[in-house]
């Protein structure tokens, strides 16, 4: 017998026979529901289990309706076969079966109460569709507008609105905040309701006598026909009973004898409208077109948009019964015990990982578990903050309270026990908590065997930072024992097995811990070092003395307090803790003394020195080999095992020693003669003198940029730059600091780089302002009741951003139930006395302290971009506002701007020609006007705040298996191993989907990378195939002699091309533009739902998708995506970012390809005008835009304007690139052709006018009529720029050389001297 394939992840086909559905009508397929196939063939892997297949089947269109079922081997049509163990791997199940015998039957089985509850919950989930859950941590989470953008016509049809116009360029979209959501997506989609209501019946639980007859639960369902169905769920399935709301009769209904093993089928038979609407819901067009928009976000928290559509709140009786459906508990004693999160995490980490299948299973379990733990933490923090959970130590100060809820250990991220008092108090504790999470994540990614880490989540909620951890086994028992020992003998007891206890006074070591942590220290590039305790005894440690090793009662070794997993930034300690700030004279003190370096900097510095060491050693090795044996001089192998570069984790760190009056602060590790301590200073200086300088230089060279604070943070962190250096970067970005940039880059910079640096500097200063605003708002929100949060946020936003509309905003309390006398006496809070002037001063002070920078005078009043600042502040604070255009200008000024907009010039960037967006028609109202609302006196009101959601930072480790597999496939493909590279990349995508799920940020990035790879090589293969076809065609049409010569000359070349064209079948099947588009579309949807609708990465995905649609000739879709990109540009930065020039140019090119020359010309003009305004008239960027604009003018028939613009381009190319540059020569050739054509056209016009003046009027009329069509094309070329240009479609797809040849005319034609010269040159050639 044949066995399943032996490859680790090989797939084989399994055939399943599903049970019938007798209650469904025969025409169910015509209604839209899929028919139950007689057999279902499923592709599975040999390491999957039937339990995995069960999950897949329950989620499939063919098996969603199944209730309780089991897998059996086929026996006969009337008799069930033997049961199959569902936890056994499929390779074991079918080990002795031939491929055609891999068959299983799916048979209905008796229900138990758990399976009934799960079946009901599955029905509720399917019927609710995209209905929002009021119990979720945010509103409108996981929203996507991708389908509304690309299928705007369908959305308009469903909303009974006029179809939007064909995409084109009509000027910038309206500059409003509401464009985060396209106009069509702002209206809630109305999905069909299948039932009016569904709930567990009030007759639950079944009486004991009926439970003995198999009754499990009772349901009450209100159908669309107006009937109330009372349903009994029994061990044999579901049936209609004879009960009513007043009378209990659980036996089958006498006149409605309906029974089914599936509740879906029972309702379809009992309610025709349920069947009809369920078919509509099942075939929802949006989820059909974009499958990823309807999938649940499972292994990560969905993105919460800062402008949220507040859903309509509907009655759902089963919403409060969900807890029973999930747990089955009706009393406290029947409630299942809380999950032991720590045991689950540690046991999951200890799963075997020796084989590929085991690693895949382990990564999948870990990511799912971390996602559930993170969600539980996000739900518990608001409850703890609201006082719903009693503290474990109620006698202590509130800041020191500890909470234990559902086995989650919750504490505030503050200095509650004065541990950080000498380092900055709460400010230092706030930083330490974040760094501890970073250390846990970093160590988790290292995945060191034998080392256990607590599950850790950091949550920012209403101005407070909270830490949620799993419970270390035996922690509280050890703490109690230590406290008792301390009271009995007065000594300081400790349960710490490794590391220091509140500093270096007491240090413990343990050989077992030392062995495990030495592996961690080596991976972290941390040097083993010696520290002295209070008695002067030396202890050798692998990590910082602050890191603590504890033994749990479960026998595992746990590592805690890993905040100082990187060394201190000694340069910052020496120069920036006190003193004057940059670009100012005021002095300020940095908030804390815990400035740590980033791990990315440590890794980059270590790699740089490793490469230098390897290069030097290789050079010496080659020189030595040359002297001894020339034949071995080319060896490239070098041994780097003797390379050593490690960093002292406690170098220059400050510790408090002693207690009471004897307490003092010491720095025990400052001897820079020790290499590991000296390395700490060197890497700190490397950050300031090279890394930051290189960042600014790369920005000036156009190698990197940032569109908003999120992108800026990612760019800085990727290079290892802390955000405290924002002020230093802003100062270094000034033109006056150019001498401090990388001179090897500066020497190659041309005119226009100033615009790139200034745009970057603006983003940097904006980020400082928004971060300081976040710190100030945190102060006001901290310890504020939830009911006052919206009023506080609205008043703060008015003082921060709404002063132009209302210079003196007055706080407004929300309308709530009148407060009691006690609460009224405490009604005056600090936020209520906030004024704009006070806030400006607080922001300036905070920027001085945290970023060592003096904010430019009047920056907040004149240069702050308020829509972008509002967006950034909401994202940093977890604030969700109602969807509307927030007006920051006075009402009169705004009305004046709105009235002036229709008469503005459409080609200028400073105005807007569209009343809704860049694609709306003038003079036509495409959507109903918004409902009238009372006039506002301020920009924000408390009712604008829809939700405040917790901001979650998690320690979830990444799956190295997925990343390694994709990278291995990519490298193999590039090296020429096409088939194995393709298979590895496809396999890695499957790994990503299994480990992270289909809707996850990491999966979306994988889709995007693979789409770009597919697009690049699919285009390359297509070009090679076209060249080969062209070569074959030319070869076939040439003479015999030419054919022989060509073959002799290019035999080697031709053999290589032939080899490249012989691609494996899997490569031909996968590497297509259609597949590239499919994966990129998936990447866009996943990015919107997991990162955010306006995340910089989402905008990049839209740009890539537009480019791929353009290359596939889907120009309308490409233009729709480009319109979305323009909207995102306005939201993230504004209309004048340097990269917008390229976006406008791309739009113009797409319109030109579609032969829409007039809007294409306007887009080119907009791009050129923006380039002149940003880069100046002499920049190479301006020259490129002028060159493109001149070609658009040629296609529009405006030759005179084309000559003027091309003269500008040629002058710039001549000055910047020189006369020998190909671009200069191309511009010169085009300009010469245009000039010759203009001269010839002028002479011909002059000749015609001279002939007509000498002819009688009647003859002129006859001649003009006879030759009207003959001269029509020539008249179009003669029209000057003041006339309306006419397009020349014949020139649309021609190259520059073709254009020049067309304009100059065929050699030998024409009577001018220039024509005769061209004819002579043509003959000589």
UniProtKB/Swiss-Prot annotation:
UniProt key word Cytoplasm: yes
Compositionally biased residues, Low complexity: 1276-1285
Residues in Clu domain copies: 311-573
UniProt-listed InterPro entries: CLU-central, CLU_dom, CLU_N, CLU_prot, GSKIP_dom_sf, TPR-like_helical_dom_sf
Major site of localization recorded for this protein: cytoplasm
Regions annotated as coiled coil: none
One Gene Ontology term, aspect cellular component: cytoplasm
Positions of region (Disordered): 893-937, 1032-1063, 1245-1325
Record's subcellular location: Cytoplasm
GO BP of this protein: intracellular distribution of mitochondria; mitochondrion organization
Biased amino acid composition, Basic residues: 1265-1275, 1314-1325
This protein's UniProt keywords: Cytoplasm
GO molecular function: mRNA binding
CDD domains linked to this entry: CLU-central (cd15466)
Keyword check for Cytoplasm: yes
Family matches, as PANTHER family: CLUSTERED MITOCHONDRIA PROTEIN HOMOLOG, EUKARYOTIC TRANSLATION INITIATION FACTOR 3 SUBUNIT EIF-3
Family membership: Belongs to the CLU family.
Subunit composition and interactions: May associate with the eukaryotic translation initiation factor 3 (eIF-3) complex.
Annotated function: mRNA-binding protein involved in proper cytoplasmic distribution of mitochondria.
Protein name as catalogued: Clustered mitochondria protein homolog
Organism per entry: Malassezia globosa (strain ATCC MYA-4612 / CBS 7966)
Designated gene of the protein: CLU1
